């Protein structure tokens, strides 16, 4: 009888553990405002992310803003006007680099926006101040730089490998350097909320082609978070199919190079550590046939058990 009771208790514990794993809440909500890597100006790189229990979003890059908000409203992600989402829900912007497909939405929507902080590393911030918000290309909506600053946006420079609070949110960010046609830089952002993390990479080429060790250093930094299961997902670009020659990658990844890099990450994090891990594929470049090919190649080459997410504009998902 005692043995039966012990077995019953074990079965109950196993069932409870299984149930708790199934109902475990997601750490972050993501709303893609733009997902493509070119041509379609109404659907360029921009991702809202927030802890699952808040509506205080930070925008990861800002290629497209308003069109993405309107699409999200169509999909009933937001039950508010586009103006309210822009002005009240988006608490700030993290800009990985200053290429137009990552900043054009920020620039165009700045007159209608509310006061908030724009975060970027020094090189990116200088480009935006000197070439965009300069009273020539566009009014200076910042609080520093050339021309007459209108002081709507606070321009905050991020130091690499230094944790910075994101104003008016529960989150912090740590910036890491990426190589995007060496010696030009892009940025990865490690977002933290409590004990949970998400990693977003701006445009990047593979270390082998870029002749850099930026990704290796990034993988080394985040490997412990993979092991501890605190990192809930990685946003990373795949711009071209494998047929794209190295000399025409222009600081981007293919499925082959992404998998090579993720194998390097698995070496650091441990065997099978990426099984079931969420990888959000960003920056797919048209034409449509190339995007189809990229997805097929990723599926074929996925020998790590990764869970690929192909985000759609205006459709939210969880990490």
Named regions from a protein language model:
Residues 39-94, 104-111, 210, 214-222:
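Pre-active-site segment of Zn-dependent metallo-hydrolases
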Residues 59-63, 89-101, 119-121, 200-203, ...:
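Active-site neighborhood of phospho(di)ester-bond hydrolases with catalytic His/Asp-centered motifs
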């Amino acid at each position: 009888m005692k043995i039966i009771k012990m077995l019953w208790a074990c079965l109950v514990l196993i069932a409870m553990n299984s149930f708790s794993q199934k109902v475990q809440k997601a750490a972050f909500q993501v709303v893609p405002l733009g997902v493509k890597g070119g041509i379609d100006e109404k659907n360029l790189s921009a991702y809202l992310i927030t802890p699952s229990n808040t509506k205080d979003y930070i925008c990861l890059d800002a290629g497209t803003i308003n069109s993405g908000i309107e699409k999200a409203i169509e999909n009933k992600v937001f039950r508010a006007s586009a103006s309210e989402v822009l002005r009240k829900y988006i608490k700030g912007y993290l800009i990985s680099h200053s290429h137009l497909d990552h900043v054009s939405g920020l620039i165009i929507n700045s007159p209608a926006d509310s006061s908030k902080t724009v975060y970027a590393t020094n090189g990116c911030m200088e480009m935006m101040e000197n070439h965009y918000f300069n009273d020539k290309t566009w009014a200076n909506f910042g609080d520093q730089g050339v021309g007459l600053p209108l002081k709507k946006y606070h321009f905050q420079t991020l130091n690499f490998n230094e944790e910075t609070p994101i104003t008016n949110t529960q989150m912090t960010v740590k910036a890491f350097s990426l190589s995007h046609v060496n010696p030009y830089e892009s940025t990865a952002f490690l977002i933290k909320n409590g004990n949970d993390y998400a990693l977003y990479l701006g445009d990047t080429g593979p270390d082998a082609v870029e002749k850099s060790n930026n990704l290796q250093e990034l993988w080394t930094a985040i490997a412990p978070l993979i092991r501890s299961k605190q990192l809930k997902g990685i946003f990373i670009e795949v711009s071209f199919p494998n047929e794209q020659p190295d000399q025409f990658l222009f600081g981007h990844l293919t499925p082959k190079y992404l998998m090579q890099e993720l194998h390097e990450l698995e070496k650091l994090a441990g065997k099978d550590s990426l099984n079931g891990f969420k990888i959000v594929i960003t920056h797919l470049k048209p034409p449509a046939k190339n995007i189809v090919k990229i997805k097929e190649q990723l599926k074929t080459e996925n020998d790590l058990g990764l869970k690929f997410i192909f985000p759609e504009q205006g459709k939210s998902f969880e990490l």
